[in-house]
Amino acid sequence: MTSTTQVLIALSSIVVAYFVKTALAKRKLNPRGLPYPPGPKGLPVIGNLTQLPQHKPWLVYKEWGRTYGDLMYLEAMGQPMIIINSLSRALDLLDKRAVNYSDRPHVPTMDLCVLMKLDWVFAFMQYGADWRNHRRAFHQYLNHNMVHNYHPIQEQETQEFLRALIARPKDFLAHTRHLFGSIIIRISYGFEDEEYNKVLVEEAEALASGFSESIIPGRYLVNAFPFLRHVPSWLPGAGFQRTMQYLRKISEKTLSEPFDNVKEALKTGNRQVGPSLAVGLIESLPDETHANRTSLEVVARNTSALSYIAGADTTVSSAQALILALAMHPEVQRKAQKEIDSVVGTDRLPNMSDKPNMPYVQAIVKEAGRWHTVLPLGFIHVSAKEDEYDGYFIPKGSFIFVNTWAIMHDPDVFKNPLQFNPERYLKNGQIDTSVLDPEAATFGFGRRICPGRWLSNDSLFLMAASLLATFNIAAPKDRTGKPIPLSLDTSSHLITAPLPYDCEFQLRSPKYAALLQK
């Protein structure tokens, strides 16, 4: 027997042993031999790794669903993944079996959270007591019975947004970021100092942007090789460490400085603070001699800081899509303005008390959230243990992706789903409760559903109503005065945003400029 033959036999034995071991391991985990959900066939060892789409994967998964159905199984390097393409499947698993599907993965991206000192953001926390304590604190001050306390802040900042649009209409995308950043910073800490809040918004934006950039596939090698997080920053190729150091400083400042300033203000009265998460949480803390004071203050500090990181990017993206949709559909603007004028008149601007009387504007906000799905694949859920569902086996530790984009663009639920049509939610001039509300999916599922959804919805409504009351929005014009066609195209990130676009804002009447000067 030649040496070459011996090597081939040895290699064959290793391969056979590997497959036997893998098969036995899977059999042990799945003793009843249940089938896995259907999905594209992968390769040995690497599974479906080379098939995973990198650009707008939600579109590919929706297309695969035509072949494999609304529950698909993929595997990459041994990591099982479940793709859900329908609302009913998502509710079955993530709502009805939430105890098993509320965890988050520990992946290299989470290591980046540690490098950036972002491990205080409870959206990334593992499911357990620590996560529950943070969510409880957040929900205590942002539940649907509490958000009315923040309506004055939303109204003040929305009027400032309108004034900025009058002064610098070309910067409308930046104005939307500032609007929602300012609302959330004020609700988080209660400071009315505009310049100070502006600094806080800019720092929080830098932190959110840095994180979003860091998790783009291929952006940093540390995502693929976690051991690189221990490489010193001075080594060639370790530039990510310097970026992480910069973001870590911002994170530490974002977490500590404003919270400590609120504590000092409440203690000494050296500056004015209004109703906010931080004020409420600090005032509810036990005496400093209490055994749990330190741990409770950590939760209060984290909860106050995470408001912006957790919510601003998604709300800004929705707002920018809403403005784009209005610029593309002047007929929608006219109908909304007719409703607004009938409710508000022309002697004041809309406020939150007008919301129940403006179903068409509410429908615009709902449709914007469906038409542009900000989180097309949501945040990853993880199965805490193996499960059987509809005759299929779901392994422990499976990554669960809900294809929210597919749900929101299902033609069986939403006729002509690529069309922006607020009237799909209306019947006899009122919200039609028989039509699926996009909020059933766009804010997440189960115990991981977004706790800031009521605040976000109110902020978007007020922006839409105030914007439509004050301005006509139009597509930009070319040199000949002809309108330049607009369309919705988005980034391919975890949180998608409309690609930059232009539009024009025209005051409906000088009266509105005068109102805003009062």
UniProtKB/Swiss-Prot annotation:
UniProt cross-references to InterPro entries, sorted A to Z: Cyt_P450, Cyt_P450_CS, Cyt_P450_E_grp-I, Cyt_P450_sf, Cytochrome_P450_fung
Highest rank taxon of the organism: Eukaryota
Pathway: Secondary metabolite biosynthesis
SUPFAM superfamilies hit by this protein: Cytochrome P450
One GO CC term on file: membrane
Glycosylation site residues: N48, N100, N292, N302, N351, N457
Binding residue positions for heme: C450
Membrane topology designation: Single-pass membrane protein
Subcellular localization: Membrane
Residues passing through the membrane, by range: 7-25
Gene Ontology MF annotations: heme binding; iron ion binding; monooxygenase activity; oxidoreductase activity, acting on paired donors, with incorporation or reduction of molecular oxygen
Cofactor: heme
CDD domains recorded: CYP64-like
Function statement: Cytochrome P450 monooxygenase; part of the gene cluster that mediates the biosynthesis of alpha-cuprenene and oxidized derivatives. The alpha-cuprenene synthase COP6 is the only sesquiterpene synthase identified in C.cinereus that appears to be part of a biosynthetic gene cluster and is highly specific since it catalyzes the cyclization of (2E,6E)-farnesyl diphosphate into only one product, alpha-cuprenene.
Family: Belongs to the cytochrome P450 family.
Protein name per Swiss-Prot or TrEMBL: Cytochrome P450 monooxygenase COX1
Organism for this UniProt entry: Coprinopsis cinerea (strain Okayama-7 / 130 / ATCC MYA-4618 / FGSC 9003)
